[in-house]
């Protein structure tokens, strides 16, 4: 059995060229309608993916900021006596503003000293309300860092707005279409002069 290799006939090339020319001349609009029908859901998916990525990046930035501030507290670079709620929020917001709205409107902080690590581990995030009316319960939130050798826990929360409308139901867990981002660090201070 032998295989024949033949070149394409001039008639075949001409037929293909005519078909492409006919397609180019067709202005009936079906291609445009098909494109729009596919472009809208594709665009929505792209925006949802981008929003998820930006949200994740915001969570990571917040986590890094929390780790950095906890390290400064642990080593005594930031003295407990010099720290109050406004200063702590300002330190966090200063770095977080590159990815969130000015003045960090959804920022909540809780920094407290604990007797044991087990006591700190027992603290839970509490939400008030039910369904679409849930919100972060900030009752008991303080900024009271402990002295040298004390055990502390810093919790940072941000109410992140979900922008993509059709993703709001599945991504948001707080009222007003927001989702709760948080970072927690627990540590024991190093020996430093109080």
Each model region followed by its residue ranges:
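Short, conserved structural patches
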Residues: 2-10, 68-194
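Alpha-helical assembly-interface signal, strongest on the long, hydrophobic N-terminal helix that forms
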Residues: 2-95
């Amino acid at each position: 059995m032998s295989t024949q290799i033949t070149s394409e006939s001039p008639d075949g090339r001409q037929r293909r060229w005519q078909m492409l020319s006919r397609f180019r001349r067709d202005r009936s609009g079906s291609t445009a309608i098909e494109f729009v029908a596919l472009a809208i859901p594709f665009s929505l998916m792209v925006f949802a993916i981008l929003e998820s990525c930006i949200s994740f990046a915001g969570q990571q930035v917040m986590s890094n900021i929390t780790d950095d501030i906890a390290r400064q507290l642990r080593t005594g670079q930031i003295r407990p006596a010099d720290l109050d709620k406004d200063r702590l929020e300002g330190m966090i917001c200063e770095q977080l503003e590159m990815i969130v709205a000015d003045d960090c409107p959804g920022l909540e902080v809780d920094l407290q000293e604990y007797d044991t690590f087990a006591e700190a581990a027992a603290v839970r995030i509490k939400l008030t309300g039910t369904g679409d009316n849930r919100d972060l319960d900030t009752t008991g939130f303080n900024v009271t860092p402990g002295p040298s050798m004390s055990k502390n826990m810093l919790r940072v929360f941000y109410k992140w707005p979900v922008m993509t409308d059709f993703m709001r139901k599945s991504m948001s867990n707080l009222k007003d279409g927001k989702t709760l981002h948080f970072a927690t660090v627990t540590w024991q201070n190093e020996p430093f002069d109080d």
